[in-house]
């Protein structure tokens, strides 16, 4: 769910997920879509593509379990869809951490109408 995703992003990046990524670039946030603006925005694009592959669960609502061991996210689910959902969220959180150097405040509240159509997943 969005709750676990936000928690993972906070743990990995140290940033407030809603404030820092809720409307970042063309792809971060609920309404995001379009050609990525930078590596940070590309993380969100790849995350949306990961969600599109899920069948049998709702990425925004369905809760899953994970643990934070030695600064590492460990997904722990028996349900295959929830396990994949957790892995999608884990991947974006790690990607955002790895690309903290590309984070650009000018894209924090980027207006989505200015986004060009992105390549399909």
From Swiss-Prot:
User: Where does the record say this protein resides?
Assistant: Secreted
Enumerate the UniProt keywords alphabetically.
Answer: Antibiotic, Antimicrobial, Disulfide bond, Myotoxin, Neurotoxin, Secreted, Toxin
As annotated in Swiss-Prot or TrEMBL, what is the tissue specificity of this protein?
Expressed by the venom gland.
Assembly, per entry: Homodimer; non-covalently linked (probable alternative/compact dimer conformation in solution).
Q: What is the effect of changing residue 35 to G?
A: In BnSP-6 and Bn-IV
- Using the UniProt annotation, give all residue ranges assigned to the region (Important for membrane-damaging activities in eukaryotes and bacteria): 105-117
Q: Where is this site: Important residue of the cationic membrane-docking site (MDoS)?
A: 105, 108
Q: Which family does it belong to?
A: Belongs to the phospholipase A2 family. Group II subfamily. K49 sub-subfamily.
Disulfide connectivity? 26-115, 28-44, 43-95, 49-121, 50-88, 57-81, 75-86
Give the source species: Bothrops pauloensis
Sorted alphabetically, the Gene Ontology BP terms of this entry are: arachidonate secretion; defense response to bacterium; lipid catabolic process; negative regulation of T cell proliferation; phospholipid metabolic process
Q: Where is this site: Hydrophobic membrane-disruption site (MDiS)?
A: 111, 114
Any one Gene Ontology molecular-function term assigned to this protein's record: phospholipid binding
Classification from the root reads: Eukaryota, Metazoa, Chordata, Craniata, Vertebrata
The name under which this protein is listed is Basic phospholipase A2 homolog BnSP-7
- Pfam families named in the record: Phospholip_A2_1
Biological role: Snake venom phospholipase A2 (PLA2) that lacks enzymatic activity. Is myotoxic and displays edema-inducing activity. Displays bactericidal activity and promotes the blockage of the neuromuscular contraction of the chick biventer cervicis muscle. Also disrupts artificial membranes, and provokes tissue damages characterized by edema, necrosis and inflammation. May act as pro-inflammatory mediators, inducing metalloproteinase and cytokine production from the inflammatory and satellite cells.
The answer to whether keyword Iron applies is no
A GO cellular component term found in this entry reads:
extracellular region
Activity regulation text = Heparin inhibits the neuromuscular effect, myotoxin activity and edema-inducing effects. Bromophenacyl bromide (BPB) inhibits the neuromuscular effect, the myotoxin activity and edema-inducing effects.
